């Protein structure tokens, strides 16, 4: 149970960061390519066969889960599960506690992402409930318990000062997974099947050589996640730290297109990933549905960029949209303000001197962050819709 939770936890990080790791979406430029990309996927003449193959693999995994659960003592099972998540949480806590206090103003961003991740966890819960026993409800609950720390890792990995810490945390997580897999009495649920389904479809590895290949694949996935987050951070800072008024219109337009293209490429990779997980058994109707959703997100991004480039954004008097955003930030930060009262008192004099300029700067920064957060929410909706469609049998 504990190991299965750890692997599900890795799956969520993989899907989530791929979709949210980049701030904006341009599907105009890639749709000329995206449609041709879809053509590369093998056409399935009988979708029922494809979904039967997927269901069969899922049944096999869940059968292993059922058998292993029946062989374990309930108390031992709970203890092992608690120990695993305690160890993961301790790793995150050591690095993140100070940052959470210092970056209280960013908590509202984490909560928005948290709501989106809740949707993914609910989806996993629904799938498990269809085929597993009541004990499987513990899986999404445990993931939810560790969720806050996971999100803090993703957020803080955007900061250059945390690059080394992020790398260390990823190594620690890998060690935990490796230790769980090597344990004689509690091997991961369905062993390496879940990891393999995320990385490369094929037969279950039954010797050390194949196991080593899968371990290397997991490491590559984690390294790729880290690279995506770091690249996204650089791209966003390059755009948002530039004064639009001092920039030639053609240059700004090129930057806007770059934002679209970067995240657009992530979505194309996601489509390839869905194809890989199912071994090529995805009906093309799903791609059409993804494409429609991507068009909607593309329109949303265009509006957000237009709003970002609007001269009125930097005026002293914000419009209703930004007033509403400021109200939201104020509400979310109330608790953080209470925790930091002592520090605020010490800095009152300096804050008073800088109130006018700081308020305007923070407002502009929050407005930019809000556009990016909304984009991340829409992207995750695309993922959820796509995965739900993938798990819904299609009649031919």
Curated annotation (Swiss-Prot):
The keyword Secreted applies. Residues 1-21 form the signal peptide. Keywords: Coiled coil, Secreted, Signal. Residues 231-256 have a biased composition (Acidic residues). The keyword Chaperone does not apply. Component of the acid-insoluble and acid-soluble organic matrix of calcified layers of the shell (at protein level). This is Coiled-coil domain-containing protein 1. It comes from Lottia gigantea (Giant owl limpet).
């Amino acid at each position: 149970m504990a190991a299965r939770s750890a692997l599900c936890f890795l799956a969520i990080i993989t899907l989530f960061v791929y979709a949210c790791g980049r701030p904006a979406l341009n599907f105009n430029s890639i749709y000329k390519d995206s449609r041709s990309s879809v053509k590369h996927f093998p056409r399935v003449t009988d979708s029922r066969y494809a979904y039967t193959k997927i269901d069969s693999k899922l049944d096999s995994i869940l059968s292993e889960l059922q058998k292993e659960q029946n062989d374990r003592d309930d108390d031992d099972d709970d203890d092992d599960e608690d120990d695993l998540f305690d160890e993961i949480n301790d790793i995150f806590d050591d690095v993140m506690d100070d940052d959470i206090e210092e970056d209280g103003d960013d908590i509202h961003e984490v909560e928005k992402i948290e709501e989106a991740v809740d949707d993914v966890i609910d989806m996993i819960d629904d799938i498990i409930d269809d085929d597993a026993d009541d004990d499987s409800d513990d899986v999404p609950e445990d993931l939810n318990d560790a969720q806050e720390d996971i999100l803090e890792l993703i957020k803080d990995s955007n900061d250059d000062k945390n690059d080394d810490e992020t790398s260390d945390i990823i190594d620690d997580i890998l060690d935990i997974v490796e230790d769980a897999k090597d344990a004689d009495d509690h091997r991961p649920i369905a062993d390496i099947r879940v990891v393999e389904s995320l990385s490369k479809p094929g037969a279950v590895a039954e010797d050390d050589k194949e196991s080593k290949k899968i371990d290397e694949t997991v490491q590559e996935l984690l390294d790729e996640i880290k690279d995506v987050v770091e690249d996204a951070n650089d791209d966003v800072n390059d755009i948002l730290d530039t004064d639009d008024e001092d920039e030639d219109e053609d240059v700004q337009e090129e930057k806007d297109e770059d934002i679209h293209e970067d995240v657009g490429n992530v979505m194309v990779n996601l489509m390839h990933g869905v194809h890989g997980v199912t071994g090529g058994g995805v009906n093309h109707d799903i791609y059409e549905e993804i494409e429609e959703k991507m068009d909607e997100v593309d329109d949303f991004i265009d509006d957000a960029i237009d709003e970002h480039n609007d001269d009125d954004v930097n005026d002293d008097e914000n419009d209703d949209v930004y007033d509403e955003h400021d109200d939201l930030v104020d509400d979310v930060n109330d608790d953080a303000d209470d925790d930091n009262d002592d520090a605020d008192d010490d800095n009152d004099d300096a804050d008073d001197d800088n109130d006018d300029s700081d308020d305007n700067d923070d407002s502009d920064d929050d407005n930019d962050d809000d556009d990016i957060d909304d984009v991340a929410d829409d992207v995750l909706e695309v993922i959820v819709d796509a995965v739900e469609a993938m798990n819904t049998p299609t009649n031919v």
